[in-house]
């Protein structure tokens, strides 16, 4: 089942400030949600988003998921660290708090999977899912299908 969540004014936490966390944040920015990033290291892109006031950053090193105790009202929690064990602890803790959770390194353990989205000028939105099993295949299908749909809509 593919669901399009309304994240307006919802609290979303991304744990991990590397390339995977940044990729997930890029997709969240247009949703008008309140994004908090927790990480001890951040890439330049995330630092620039913080300067623009688009995200809040809590710079800290995590060894476990106990920091979630201070953020109980998170609608969505994305675990995107480079530590599979920590990501699993974050997902388990977040789930116990009633949040939707996602582990970037283990979509099968997550409450949802990311789809490959085609959005054509606010006219059409198509989601392609492999149920988290093959994001690369979903991306290839999206690229081919996007070209076809653009040609149809532009006629």
Give the location of each predicted region.
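Conserved SAM-binding strand-loop segment of SAM-dependent methyltransferases
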Residues: 55-61
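Residue-level detector of alpha-helix initiation sites
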Residues: 18-20, 84-85, 132
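Hydrophobic beta-strand scaffold residues
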Residues: 35, 57, 100-101
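Adenosine-phosphate binding glycine-rich loop
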Residues: 6, 118-155
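Short acidic/histidine-rich motifs immediately flanking catalytic phosphotransfer sites
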Residues: 53, 71-76
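ADP-ribose/adenylate-binding Rossmann-like module
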Residues: 76-81, 87-114
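Short amphipathic alpha-helix with an adjacent loop that forms part of the alpha/beta core around
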Residues: 63-73
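Hydrophobic, well-ordered beta-alpha structural blocks that scaffold small-molecule cofactor pockets
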Residues: 1-50
């Amino acid at each position: 089942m593919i669901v399009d969540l309304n994240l307006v004014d919802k609290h979303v936490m991304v744990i991990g400030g590397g390339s995977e966390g940044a990729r997930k944040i890029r997709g969240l920015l247009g949703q008008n949600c309140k994004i908090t990033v927790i990480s001890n290291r951040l890439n330049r892109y995330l630092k620039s988003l913080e300067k623009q006031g688009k995200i809040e950053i809590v710079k800290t090193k995590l060894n476990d998921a106990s920091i979630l105790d201070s953020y109980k009202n998170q609608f969505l929690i994305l675990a995107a660290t480079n530590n599979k064990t920590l990501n699993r602890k974050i997902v388990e803790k977040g789930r116990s708090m009633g949040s939707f959770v996602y582990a970037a390194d283990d979509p099968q353990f997550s409450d949802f999977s990311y789809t490959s989205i085609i959005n054509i000028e606010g006219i059409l939105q198509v989601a392609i899912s492999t149920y988290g099993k093959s994001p690369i295949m979903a991306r290839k299908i999206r690229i081919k299908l996007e070209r076809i749909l653009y040609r149809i809509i532009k006629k």
